[in-house]
């Protein structure tokens, strides 16, 4: 009787893993370093675009995000207080709005979902009575 070992050959498994690694192309999800470099590029771009971030000083990612949030809030305030936007908003409130509020759309979708569930239950009950 011949004895055998339950352990696989190291050479065989490493060769298989190596050949699979070559055949498969790496995506950003597969390569964490690629994802990290991509995120760092995004932070660099944000640092360039936001005027309140000092360009010649090293800032943390958290500081960059805080500057971005502050900048967006400042832009929103400037937009809300701009005279032409304020007059446009008052004209729209007085007249009819051209778009449906999202709450009304969500309510309609909920009603349709309930109706579809009821119809599905009715069809299931009918098919059970037709097929003994």
Swiss-Prot record:
Gene Ontology CC terms, in alphabetical order: cytoplasm; nucleus; protein-containing complex
InterPro entries: bHLH_dom (IPR011598), DNA-bd_prot-inh (IPR026052), HLH_DNA-bd_sf (IPR036638)
Domain bHLH positions: 23-75
Pfam family, one: HLH
Subcellular location: Cytoplasm; Nucleus
GO molecular function: bHLH transcription factor binding; protein dimerization activity
Gene3D superfamilies: Helix-loop-helix DNA-binding domain
SMART domains: HLH (SM00353)
Transmembrane regions listed in the UniProt entry: none
Listed GO biological process terms: cellular senescence; embryonic digestive tract morphogenesis; endodermal digestive tract morphogenesis; negative regulation of gene expression; negative regulation of transcription by RNA polymerase II; neuron fate commitment; positive regulation of blood pressure; positive regulation of DNA-templated transcription
Keywords: Biological rhythms, Cytoplasm, Developmental protein, Nucleus, Repressor, Transcription, Transcription regulation
Function: Transcriptional regulator (lacking a basic DNA binding domain) which negatively regulates the basic helix-loop-helix (bHLH) transcription factors by forming heterodimers and inhibiting their DNA binding and transcriptional activity. Inhibits the activity of both neurogenic (neurod1/neuroD) and myogenic (myod1/myoD) bHLH factors. May play a role in the regulation of the circadian clock.
Assembly and interaction partners: Heterodimer with other HLH proteins.
The protein, known as: DNA-binding protein inhibitor ID-2
Organism of this sequence: Xenopus tropicalis
């Amino acid at each position: 009787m011949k004895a055998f070992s339950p352990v696989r050959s190291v050479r065989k498994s490493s060769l298989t893993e190596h050949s699979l690694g070559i055949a498969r192309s790496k995506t950003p999800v597969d390569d964490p370093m690629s994802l990290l470099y991509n995120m760092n590029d995004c932070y660099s771009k944000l640092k360039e675009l936001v005027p309140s971030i000092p360009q010649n000083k090293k800032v943390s990612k958290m500081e960059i995000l805080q500057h971005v949030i502050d900048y967006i809030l400042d832009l929103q305030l400037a937009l809300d207080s701009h005279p032409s936007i304020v007059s446009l908003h008052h004209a729209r409130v007085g007249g009819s709005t051209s778009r449906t509020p999202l709450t009304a759309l969500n309510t309609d979708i909920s009603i349709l979902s309930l109706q579809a569930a009821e119809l599905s239950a009715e069809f299931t009950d009918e098919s059970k009575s037709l097929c003994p």
